[in-house]
Every structure is written in structure tokens, then in C-alpha cells.
Design a protein with these regions (language model features):
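Soluble "head" domains of membrane/secretory-pathway proteins
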Residues: 1-194
């Protein structure tokens, strides 16, 4: 079946051999634009509601660099580093909702389009809006090159089964245990229904 708005899908962009996981926000025929960081579908801004900021551990996969996340690193008393991220709950026209990260009010993808999604194509965006290689960007800017054809979408991503912090060695499976991000394992990727 065709993806629906809010689905998280696995895809390989045309002409590339790297898999991506992104969220479907635009369907064939939809007019998509982004203004001031707000996603607009068919002329209607998507509902956005700020949530409590979230602390995530700084690790090799989520380094929380000062360039990308100015003033967001926090050192706890035990010496551990954390990144404090603003979370925005978006609710799509079909009532499905999910959380996004939106740190920079003026990032390159915060103003885009409008574009009409072609037949049998889907407009995809990442939930980390300021740092996502998605349909807003051409491939030479590490994006998906626009809306993605149906045949390049492999299927839905349902859950995170295994998540490592980047400190493990491919050749040392024992290191996978210390690098496991247990809080992410077996969490759903699907949006909440309205």
C-alpha cells in the first residue's frame, strides 16, 4: 500500500545507493512549502505545539557540536555531557502527530517552495528539521533531490530495534553492549493517531 502522511519510510534516493529513513509529509498532488520553519500543506500551516525541552546524551552519533547547537551542551555533576533540545509536536492534517527538533529559527531548510508533489512521488522530511538530508534539498547538498518516486521507497520503518552510540567497534561485538542506547531500543517510529 502507498505510504500515508506521517509514516516513517526507508528509501534509496534515485541515483544513490544509500538508504535513508524519513517521514512522509507530502502526498502526490500536495502543494508543499516551509515558511519560517512551519510546514505548510495545501496552503494550511501544520499545527505546532512546543513541548518540554529534551536532554539527550552527547555521544559519537549525537555530538551536539557547538557549531550546530550553540549553547545547547550541558555538563552534569557526574561529568557527563548532554544536549538540551527544543521539541515541537507537529500534527498533520490527517491527525497524526510526532515530535520534531527545531533549534535554529533561520536554518537553510526553514524557507522552501512551494512545490507540487508529482504523481507517484512523496515529499519526505526528517524530524531533526535543521539537520536533515530530505526532500527540501538537492542531492549535491546531501538532500534527497526533491520528492522521492514511489518505486524508491522500500517500506515503512516501524520500530528501532538496536541503537548504538557510535563508540563501538564493528570488529568487537562485546563493545556493542557498552555502546547500546537502551532507551531507544524497541521504541515505535510511527506517529500517534489524533
Amino acid at each position: 500500500s502507498d505510504p500515508e502522511r506521517g509514516d516513517v519510510v526507508i528509501l534509496t534516493p534515485p541515483g544513490m545507493n544509500t538508504d535513508y529513513i524519513k517521514r512522509v509529509v507530502g502526498l502526490p498532488g500536495d502543494r508543499i512549502e516551509v515558511r519560517g520553519g512551519v510546514l505548510i500543506i495545501n496552503g494550511q500551516p501544520v499545527k505546532r505545539a512546543p513541548k518540554e525541552e529534551r536532554l539527550i546524551p552527547v555521544d559519537m552519533n549525537d555530538p551536539c557540536s557547538p557549531e550546530d547547537y550553540p549553547d545547547r551542551r550541558i555538563a552534569k555533576d557526574d561529568g557527563s555531557l548532554w544536549c538540551k533540545l527544543p521539541i515541537i509536536r507537529e500534527t498533520l492534517p490527517n491527525g497524526r502527530s510526532y515530535d520534531t527538533v527545531d533549534v535554529d529559527p533561520d536554518s537553510p531548510g526553514d524557507n522552501f517552495g512551494p512545490i507540487t508533489v508529482p504523481d507517484r512521488h512523496f515529499f519526505l522530511m526528517g524530524d531533526n528539521r535543521d539537520h536533515s538530508a530530505d526532500s527540501r534539498f538537492p542531492q549535491w547538498q546531501r538532500g534527497l533531490g526533491g520528492p522521492v518516486p514511489w518505486e524508491n521507497i522500500g517500506g515503512k520503518a516501524e520500530i528501532i530495534t538496536f541503537s548504538l552510540d557510535g563508540s563501538s567497534s564493528t570488529f568487537n561485538p562485546v563493545s556493542w553492549l557498552t555502546a547500546l542506547r537502551a532507551g531507544r531500543a524497541f521504541t515505535s517510529l510511527q506517529p500517534k493517531e489524533g
